[in-house]
């Protein structure tokens, strides 16, 4: 019973800390990661369909690299 209460309090505390940190850092991020394929396709660093690619580099505009070519 005590352990359950301690775990619940710890989870609530960690959640509150994350929310506070996220609220404080809003708009201050300088190098934002490309998170969607729409943003990735507008980037000049991505490769078009049929171009050679590497699965490790994530450099296709479509977001998928199969058999060494962007899909």
Curated annotation (Swiss-Prot):
A GO molecular-function descriptor: calcium channel regulator activity
Localization annotation: Secreted
Annotated signal sequence range: 1-22
Pfam families xrefs: Conotoxin
Site (Binds Cav2.2/CACNA1B calcium channel): 49, 55, 58, 62, 64, 66
Keywords: Amidation, Calcium channel impairing toxin, Disulfide bond, Ion channel impairing toxin, Knottin, Neurotoxin, Pharmaceutical, Presynaptic neurotoxin, Secreted, Signal, Toxin, Voltage-gated calcium channel impairing toxin
Disulfide bonds: 46-61, 53-65, 60-70
Domain of life: Eukaryota
Result of altering residue 56 to I: In omega-5; 1.8-fold decrease in inhibition of Cav2.2/CACNA1B and decrease in efficacy to kill goldfish (LD(50) is 0.93 mg/kg by intramuscular injection)
Tissue: Expressed by the venom duct.
Assigned GO CC terms: extracellular region; host cell presynaptic membrane
Prodomain residues: 23-45
Modified residues (Cysteine amide): 70
Family the UniProt entry places it in: Belongs to the conotoxin O1 superfamily.
Role: Omega-conotoxins act at presynaptic membranes, they bind and block voltage-gated calcium channels. This toxin blocks Cav2.2/CACNA1B calcium channels (IC(50)=0.67-208 nM). It acts by neutralizing the outer electronegativity and sterically hindering the ion access path to the entrance of the channel selectivity filter. It also shows antiproliferative effects on different glioma cell lines (M059J, U-138MG and U-251MG). In vivo, is lethal to fish. In vivo, injection into mammals induces adverse effects, such as tremor, diminution of spontaneous locomotor activity and bad coordinated locomotion.
Name under which the protein is recorded: Omega-conotoxin MVIIA
Classification of source organism: Eukaryota, Metazoa, Spiralia, Lophotrochozoa, Mollusca
